[in-house]
Amino acid sequence: MQLDEVKNVLIDTLNLGPAGQALQADSPLLGSLPELDSMAVVTLIGALEEHFGIMIDDDDISASTFETLGSLAAFVSAKMA
């Protein structure tokens, strides 16, 4: 799983700073991070595509994808497979 890399992209994209380092696989994202609004989701998707060299279609994404850091990392890993 790409947990640490996804976490770093998330921290950089949302400008979470040192507080972002506390995020764990089971840390809730959507609805829990005020920085992760609808525009930030779009920006984050672009950053993940660029960093990991993947393509993410709108149909691939659901709220459960962004439920936790672990679910987001698992999604990225699956896209890379």
Where are the language model's segments positioned?
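Conserved catalytic core of two-component sensor histidine kinases
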Residues: 42
